[in-house]
Amino acid sequence: MKNKLPPFIEIYRALIATPSISATEEALDQSNAGLITLLADWFKDLGFNVEVQPVPGTRNKFNMLASTGQGAGGLLLAGHTDTVPFDDGRWTRDPFTLTEHDGKLYGLGTADMKGFFAFILDTLRDVDVTKLKKPLYILATADEETSMAGARYFSETTSLRPDCAIIGEPTSLQPVRAHKGHISNTIRVMGQSGHSSDPARGVNAIELMHDAIGHILQLRDTLKERYHYEAFTVPYPTLNLGHIHGGDAANRICACCELHMDIRPLPGMTLNDLNGLLNEALAPVSERWPGRLTVEELHPPIPGYECPPDHQLVEVVEKLLGTHTEVVNYCTEAPFIQTLCPTLVLGPGSINQAHQPDEYLETRFIKPTRELITQVIHHFCWH
């Protein structure tokens, strides 16, 4: 029953008060079961059918799909339920208590992105879902902030094929139709230790890594020269050497050296092609030192994403908002949802607040976000 649904600010408050941190470090990682239960109960109260999906390979994480309406097509509104960990020493407020001050709603997940579900629920209390001519789906996913396991698994297992989808990440209500992907790898070189007084009796892993880095930097130049997408502020794939460690003493030949690096591919670049380019770049080192160099994934890769600029979803949203779509450098779940249907990233709050101490969402987004959700439901589910 709709009258059981709490007021907007109380929905928001309950979502923020329910911890759902995702982290690679097990001690910090939390289940999102409590948040999924909250959302499932509220959508059931609104008359939706609700399915809760365990996500394999996670620490008790779940997706939730709420659906209403019959037939094919329709609209999918999607978002993730998890937040990043917080630095207690840098927050001046309780991260799990929603507080309002000076036109801002503070709390962990207010912008990124629990708030989007509060907006959806509050908007739907004024929508007669029994009159929808096409289905409306609400997807809440797990582990976006780490592996994107929830969106990956959902996209691999669902038969759902909506007409289009909107992911409510904080974009300041500016529609995003493309972003780069992310590949992160560990390059590991195994040498042979020995006393530094006799270098010929060992194989110095740092020296081999120095050689490997030279080839990787040549690959960086190749990517910059070969691939371009002028809509991006950085219009080429970037390659970054982010972390290196090797050796344990000045008087020992280094036995192991490890490098962490990432590549941000443009939309349209396949992950297989990029991995092939990396292996090709490192081939001279591998051939000279067989069995001593390995490449492993640090995290599951995320492909680049693009919604066709001439798709109806882009045209409708640009008309509703009176603005043009943008492209961004950060990653979202859009590449996985895009395998189901054309997808835009569009939601309240600023990306500049994501992962920040004293995270907040400005209250000026409340009215236009409600209006936008109402308008897209009307357009894609009532016509």
Swiss-Prot record:
Zn(2+) 2 binds at residues 112, 145, 355. GO terms for biological process: L-arginine biosynthetic process. Its main location: cytoplasm. InterPro entries: AcOrn-deacetyl (IPR010169), ArgE/DapE_CS (IPR001261), Bact_exopeptidase_dim_dom (IPR036264), Peptidase_M20 (IPR002933), Peptidase_M20_dimer (IPR011650), Peptidase_M20A (IPR050072). Zn(2+) 1 binds at residues 80, 112, 169. Its cofactor is Zn(2+); Co(2+); glutathione. Binds 2 Zn(2+) or Co(2+) ions per subunit. Pathway: Amino-acid biosynthesis; L-arginine biosynthesis; L-ornithine from N(2)-acetyl-L-ornithine (linear): step 1/1. It comes from the Bacteria. The gene is argE. One of its GO terms (cellular component) is cytoplasm. Belongs to the peptidase M20A family. ArgE subfamily. It catalyses: N(2)-acetyl-L-ornithine + H2O = L-ornithine + acetate. It comes from Escherichia fergusonii (strain ATCC 35469 / DSM 13698 / CCUG 18766 / IAM 14443 / JCM 21226 / LMG 7866 / NBRC 102419 / NCTC 12128 / CDC 0568-73). It is found in: Cytoplasm. Homodimer. This is Acetylornithine deacetylase. Pfam families: M20_dimer, Peptidase_M20. Signal peptide: none annotated. The active site is at 82, 144. One of its GO terms (molecular function) is zinc ion binding. Its EC number is 3.5.1.16. Catalyzes the hydrolysis of the amide bond of N(2)-acetylated L-amino acids. Cleaves the acetyl group from N-acetyl-L-ornithine to form L-ornithine, an intermediate in L-arginine biosynthesis pathway, and a branchpoint in the synthesis of polyamines. Keywords: Amino-acid biosynthesis, Arginine biosynthesis, Cobalt, Cytoplasm, Hydrolase, Metal-binding, Zinc. Transmembrane segments: none annotated. PROSITE patterns: ARGE_DAPE_CPG2_1, ARGE_DAPE_CPG2_2.
